[in-house]
Amino acid sequence: MLAYYVSVNQGPGIEQKSLPQLTRLLDQGRVKALVFIRDTSTGQTFLEGRYTRPAGPTENAEIVVPFRTVVDLEFNRDLKQFLASKGFPEIDVKVIHNFWGQAFLSVLPFLLFILALYFLFRQQIRMAGRGAFSFGKSRARLLSGGKTKVTFKDVAGVEEAKEEVQELVEFLKDPKKFQKLGGRIPKGVLMVGPPGTGKTLLAKAIAGEADVPFFSISGSDFVEMFVGVGASRVRDMFEQARRHAPCIVFIDEIDAVGRARGTGLGGGHDEREQTLNALLVEMDGIESQEGVIVIAATNRKDVLDPALLRPGRFDREVRVNLPDIRGREQILRVHAQKIKLSKNADLSALARGTPGFSGAELANLINEAALIAAKKGKDNVDQPDLEEARDKVRWGKERRSLAMSEEERKTTAYHEAGHAVLNVLLENTDPIHKVTIIPRGPALGVTMMLPASDKYNARKKEVLDDLCVAMGGRVAEEVFLGDISSGASGDIRQATWYARKMVCEWGMSEKLGMVHYADDSSMVFLGRELGTSRGYSEATARAIDHEVQHFIQAAYEKAKRIILEHKDKVEALAQALLEYETLNADQVTEIVKTGKMTNPPSKNSSPVSNGGEASSTKSPARQEETTKDGGLLPGLEGAPA
């Protein structure tokens, strides 16, 4: 329309002449006709007429050419007089009314603006929920056996959990086998366990094995910025599930929507509670139906609402724990199938050296070993690559580029020597694996210990010896350097944590006895924290602090007594660390037992300025007791030296 409007105004074959050009044509007497035109749609005024052009070589007569000159004739008296002198005393006036063109031009900006808004909102609506009215629709993805290649053969190390979820698949395939005895399929199964143990992998295996529809959704997919969307999505998901019954609904990280009600401050939790109420009704309410099995996974069962956990909603709880030595070996063999492994690789030995590792960490270990071997240009992955990957995953990568002064290296060497000597001399400690003053991860130096086997209980004499080893670094600094550093901050922090566990939870204090004094610090809800009072008096709190201090002070004095008795061994080990930087278990034990080393390692090619952080680390020997940090005790991590 715009092109049409312009073509109408301009006319076909009309030449545009300027005022000087028109003046020349008038002087030459070539202008034959003139009309004054006023265009009301554009507000322009111009002269329009015809002039003659001499004939060309191929033309027989003069050519008459239409032209147009934009000019304001009404206010140009000189031009009027000039035109009158050239034979045009009176000029006709013509008014043009182009209503449709004018109307179109006036609304064109608004049309463009509305069009831009339309495309913008259309794109956002598509991104938000596949349509303007689909915010309340379920985002559960429907999977079938052909869409996932994971089966129960790919799940290893959690045999008991695998057996329990396999029963669901067997029931769906042959329900009469169970129904003839009056049994019914569980309405819900809650998989609980630490992160990385294979809960989601089990769900993928169920999807790969089951011959029924499998809906998969995350707990966070129910929550949206709009009020009421979560409850609507829950209802829509179960409505779809009932249409496809019998089927399985898997909710990953259900703690995102199933947290206990009545906690938290403000109104943000009301929407989540509304979503949870809808979930409770759909799982076991008036309109609930059999044939829809709900499987959920979480690593925070303690935060879930009690109404969600009762039988009728989740009839069965499946514990997916950290794998034992046999489970770790099975997991390693599953993941080792994806890499080129050399014949000398011993996965059984690697499984013994990875206590406390989850399935995800073992998968990462195998991948790191493959990357290390590829970086070295090898054709396959051998045992040293696996050992190096294990140390990297557990204690961090070596930081050889970190430059430190000789004084700091010396402090680190004596600190680690103190840990190592006590670890060898004391009876109830885990075997030493390696000692290094090369930085690893956040630590400047590491004393590595690996348990000989999986441990599930902490005996008191083991805990006391561990506390003594933790004090070894600080004592060695004090005895040999005459000063102390901040390198023991991680040891002190975790020794305090361990001693408080002994007093408050494990009943290992003779003074306070077998009473549980611990606050429920695992609860992360502000509302529940505000409503919880400490279950003991101020006098008891002071007694707890005194007992914690007593355990740590006793460990410190014992460590100091042993190090003073074996100063020559600590000195020899520290000097060996300064010279070689890294010593293995046999070399450390030989120095502690004989005072010398007959089979020293090759000297490190790295600059002697590379040092380490005065810290010790030990693998988590007790899988039930882990903390945020890693380190000498379960979860201990060093601090700057």
From Swiss-Prot:
One of its GO terms (biological process) is proteolysis. ATP binds at G193, P194, P195, G196, T197, G198, K199, T200. This is ATP-dependent zinc metalloprotease FtsH 2. One of its GO terms (cellular component) is plasma membrane. Acts as a processive, ATP-dependent zinc metallopeptidase for both cytoplasmic and membrane proteins. Plays a role in the quality control of integral membrane proteins. It is found in: Cell inner membrane. SMART domains: AAA. The gene is ftsH2. Residues 122-641 are cytoplasmic. Its cofactor is Zn(2+). Pfam families: AAA (PF00004), AAA_lid_3 (PF17862), Peptidase_M41 (PF01434). Keywords: ATP-binding, Cell inner membrane, Cell membrane, Hydrolase, Membrane, Metal-binding, Metalloprotease, Nucleotide-binding, Protease, Transmembrane, Transmembrane helix, Zinc. SUPFAM superfamilies: FtsH protease domain-like, P-loop containing nucleoside triphosphate hydrolases. In the central section; belongs to the AAA ATPase family. Residues 1-100 are periplasmic. HAMAP family: FtsH. The keyword Transmembrane helix applies. The active site is at E416. Zn(2+) binds at H415, H419, D491. The chain crosses the membrane at residues 101-121. Residues 599-610, 630-641 have a biased composition (Low complexity). It comes from the Bacteria. It comes from Methylacidiphilum infernorum (isolate V4) (Methylokorus infernorum (strain V4)). The keyword Transmembrane helix applies.
